[in-house]
Regions:
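Binding-site signature for planar aromatic cofactors or substrates
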Residues: 1-146
């Protein structure tokens, strides 16, 4: 895969396995890039990504003000992908959680492989959901899949 305007089925499956961490880049008020890791991410289809975040998070505020977003996905198997698009608040408050969690929807405009011949990606970002957040995480994913 060189570049495209949509996700391949392989990338959709990788994102939707619910163990994938991506890095989301947004634009701060002063024009600087702002990055943050996200685990609550779901590929709704080949042209749409959803992710959820706290309404108090910088990423949320940046998307409300300026919807330009870039998502970086790196995973084992030499996967390195940049996903560019425009994001907006799709749902201000998730019904499945009591915390202030919003769902963001991103319309994908560009997808490209960032694999290099110099080095191979052997692992993505790994994390483990803390026990007290497992139920909330399940609710977030259930809602993002609707």
């Amino acid at each position: 895969m060189m570049s495209s305007n949509e996700l391949s089925q392989e990338v959709i499956d990788l994102i939707n396995r619910q163990a994938t961490i991506v890095v989301v880049a947004t634009v701060d008020e002063d024009g600087s890039p702002r990055t943050a890791p996200f685990g609550w991410v779901y590929a709704r289809d080949s042209k749409t990504l959803r992710f959820s975040t706290s309404r108090g998070h910088d990423t949320y505020r940046n998307i409300v003000r300026d919807g330009r977003v870039m998502v970086c996905l790196m995973e084992e198997g030499n996967t390195a992908i940049s996903i560019k698009g425009n994001a907006r608040v799709y749902k201000e408050q998730l019904e499945s959680v009591s915390r202030r969690i919003a769902m963001i929807e991103m319309d994908i405009t560009y997808v490209k492989s960032d694999v290099t011949r110099v080095a191979s990606v052997i692992s993505g970002i790994k994390c483990k959901i803390n026990k007290e957040y497992v139920e909330m995480t399940e609710g977030v994913y259930t809602e993002m899949m609707i």
